[in-house]
Amino acid sequence: MNRQMGRKRLIIYPLCLVLAAAVVVSAAFAAKFIGYKNAPLELSPAFTVTGHTGCMGEKDNSLEAMRAAIGAGAKVVEFDLNFGENKVPVLSHDIPTGGEVTLEEAFRLLSENPNIQANIDAKSTENLVAVGKLAKKYMLEKQLFFTGISEDDVAAVKRDCPSIPYYLNVDVKKGRVKDESYLEELASKVISSGAVGINMHKRAVTKELCSFFKSRGILVSVYTVDSAYDMYRVLSCAPDNITSKKPDKLINIVNQKTNIK
């Protein structure tokens, strides 16, 4: 009997510790969530919400996803750029296999919505000349900008699409975002590249980082912001753009916090 009791204690005690730790973590998370939710909204006048490709449950890189983003109230639609057979520009995250929506189809839809911008996430820069020609054909240069651009891609963008601005994709090191010399290094990299801003993952964004880059005239775009927690947290950092698979929810939060009905 005593052995059985001892075994039960050996099992129950660690479980209690795990549960207690879970409660503490949950409480801390809830406290942070409430803090972000109640934080004042200090967005830039030009703040935009981008509907990530595949938003609102639609298929990635589809015209339906673009229409869904526009219908949800997003002022920017995002899609991936790649090049298929004969280097024809198409909407695809991976190497095209055929049947993809062409960039011309996407541009045709965009031309019907002159108040909407397109965030072209370049997965390849193989034939940007064709992209530039299509942009001119549909007179869309002012409605477009590139993301997904690395330092190695900058020369191709400048050469082949000189009238289309671009954000530099940077893998910001989360552990160094409080290091001003590191931020200065990143800012210099963005400015010297000719980019209008930095495109970064949500995990490393902070209010201080956004403030620092804005003081240098650098726009900050943050992607993969899909949960309510992340929406409130990233909004509290005051970036210039947030890209989300759920633009309707993000827009609703912004409207609630700014008392717009």
Predicted feature locations:
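Phosphate-group recognition and catalysis centered on beta-loop-alpha active-site segments
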Residues: 2-261
